[in-house]
């Protein structure tokens, strides 16, 4: 999810030497909206999330058990008024969770996966 706080900052995770947005796999019986909110909560520790509009779908490949897999990610706009401490889901390889400004993201675009950066440019001023 693309989560914005009241300061206009966006929630990012840092994993595998890259900035990324929280996301994950849909569990059986879940709809996409429930999955999106649950994954943000699990990966970041953020509570009090308000789900907004669907922003689109992106695709990327990754290796799983030696095979290339294609993953579709359904992105949603979200917001939160929470000021509580964030908790990275370390078992998922997430090293830290931070609220970042559009200015910071513009200055650190090399730390963002190219496919995600392309998506972010459509929705943020970076």
Which ranges hold each PLM region?
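N-terminal strand-loop-strand
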Residues: 1-22
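A short local loop/turn or secondary-structure capping micro-motif enriched for an aromatic residue
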Residues: 19-22, 29, 116-117
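Unchanged
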Residues: 26-113
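Charged phosphate-binding loop/patch that engages nucleotide di/tri-phosphates or the phosphate backbone
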Residues: 111-126
């Amino acid at each position: 999810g693309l989560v914005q706080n009241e300061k206009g900052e966006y929630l990012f995770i840092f994993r595998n030497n890259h900035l990324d947005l929280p996301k994950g796999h849909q569990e059986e019986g879940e709809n996409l909206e429930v999955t999106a909110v649950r994954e943000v909560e699990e990966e970041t520790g953020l509570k009090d999330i308000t789900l907004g509009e669907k922003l689109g779908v992106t695709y990327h490949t990754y290796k799983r058990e030696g095979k290339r897999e294609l993953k579709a990610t359904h992105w949603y706009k979200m917001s939160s008024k929470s000021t509580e401490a964030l908790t990275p889901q370390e078992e998922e390889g997430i090293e830290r969770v931070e609220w970042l400004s559009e200015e910071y993201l513009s200055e650190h675009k090399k730390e963002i996966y190219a496919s995600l950066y392309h998506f972010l440019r459509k929705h943020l001023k970076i």
